[in-house]
Regions:
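Short glycine-aspartate micro-motif
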Residues: 1-5, 68-72, 101, 119-123, ...
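ATP-binding/phosphotransfer module of carbohydrate and carboxylate kinases, centering on a glycine-rich
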Residues: 1-60, 66-68, 113-118, 163-331
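Solvent-exposed alpha-helices and their adjacent loops that cap or buttress functional pockets
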Residues: 6, 64, 93-95, 112-116, ...
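Short glycine-rich anion-binding loops that position phosphate/pyrophosphate groups of nucleotides
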Residues: 9, 76-79, 126-129, 265
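Short beta-strand-loop/turn "lid" adjacent to the catalytic site in phosphate-handling enzymes
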Residues: 50-101, 111-114, 257
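Glycine/charged-rich beta-loop-alpha catalytic/anionic-binding loops adjacent to active sites
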Residues: 69-71, 91-94, 98, 137-146, ...
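Active-site nucleophile and cofactor-binding loops and adjacent substrate-binding regions
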Residues: 100-108, 123-124, 149-152, 288-298
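Glycine-rich phosphate-binding loop of actin/hexokinase-like ATP-binding domains
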Residues: 117-174
């Protein structure tokens, strides 16, 4: 079985046997079909599939048939059903397996975080998203297309808010904040406005702005009001997603796992986590939150093993334990 977890910032591929042994893995950059086109994005996956196969001692260059029985691909930017179908068709066309299932990458986080057949997952990493699942297959989802669909936060969004508050503090349009000096110091420039200019001119890569998330946390820990407000706003958004998903699935008053993951949440910053847990307990007192740092590719692999088990081709509890243990050793 071929497990793929392709996020905005990195992609992991694993070749896993039906009993949970990990034969080969590969890691690459982010999966962004909106920048590269679908074919270009799948080409990037193909290179990683070949790398994982090579580690397993397999050569897939000769066209000798499918590499695996099944592909379980959990992909960022597969946000709409039409996108999932398009990507599933594109991956299936590569001939890596007999069957292919594509899902949004947040489902990998959910599966990595719980073996229960129901629950909710919120990812807050480069972006922010949420999914929920019931045993009968019903789901709760959000478009997660950014501000245009009501999203706020994630590392990318928070970083822009930090820049917004910092530059406005410097030019007089906003309240003073320690963020301004902290942003300037982080990049070794004279001011936050100078950082903005450097990003605009290409002197500082825009991709480095995510480095401002720890800067925000530090200023919040030191009591800067603007920084504290941003952290609290992020907590509100995380809980809003989780509570709405729970409500849609009829789980708001039930004992259900709420899996929290992605780089921003995995950092377990105390102010953020305290705010998330307090707010979640107020709206869903029986919810069982858990922060997951297990690589999401484990979730993709577990979903693949679930598929094999449903087809009587392997999988099962022992295989799930084996794949979790294998990745724990690799960490």
């Amino acid at each position: 079985m071929l497990a793929i977890d392709a996020g905005n910032s990195k992609t992991d591929v694993a070749l896993v046997t039906a009993d949970g042994a990990v034969l080969g893995t590969a890691r690459g950059g982010g999966f962004r079909p909106y920048l590269t086109g679908t074919d270009g994005a799948i080409d990037g996956l193909a290179a990683l599939v070949a790398e994982a196969a090579a580690e397993a001692g397999l050569d897939i260059s000769g066209g000798q048939g499918p590499l695996a029985t099944h592909v379980s691909a959990c992909l960022a930017n597969a946000d709409l059903p039409v996108e999932e179908r398009e990507l599933q068709q594109a991956i299936a066309a590569r001939g890596w397996s007999r069957t292919t299932v594509v899902a949004n990458d947040t489902f990998a986080l959910l599966r990595a975080g719980t073996d229960a057949p129901r629950g909710v997952a919120v990812v807050c990493g480069a972006g922010i998203n949420c999914v929920g699942l019931l045993p009968d297959g019903r789901t709760a989802r959000f478009p997660a297309l950014g501000q245009i669909t009501g999203d706020w936060g994630g590392g990318g969004g928070i970083s822009l808010e930090v820049m917004w508050s910092s530059t406005r503090a410097e030019d007089g349009r906003g309240e003073p904040t320690a963020l301004a000096g902290a942003v300037a110091a982080h990049f070794g420039l004279a001011s936050a406005s100078a950082v903005a200019e450097a990003v605009h001119l290409g002197e500082v890569p825009e991709g480095r702005l995510h480095e401002l998330v720890p800067v925000l946390f530090r200023c919040a820990e030191e009591g800067d009001p603007t920084a504290v407000q941003l952290v609290e706003r992020q907590a509100e958004e995380i809980v809003a997603l989780a509570s709405v998903a729970l409500r849609r699935l009829g789980l708001l008053d039930s004992a259900a796992d709420v899996v929290l993951g992605g780089g921003v949440l995995a950092a377990r910053q105390p102010l953020l986590m305290d705010a998330v847990l307090t707010r979640l307990a107020a709206v869903a007192p029986l919810a069982q939150p858990r922060v997951v740092t297990t690589p999401p590719v484990v979730g993709a692999a577990l979903l693949g093993l679930d598929h094999l088990a449903s087809a009587s081709l392997g999988g099962g509890a022992a295989a799930q334990d084996a794949v979790r243990a294998a990745f724990a050793l690799r960490d």
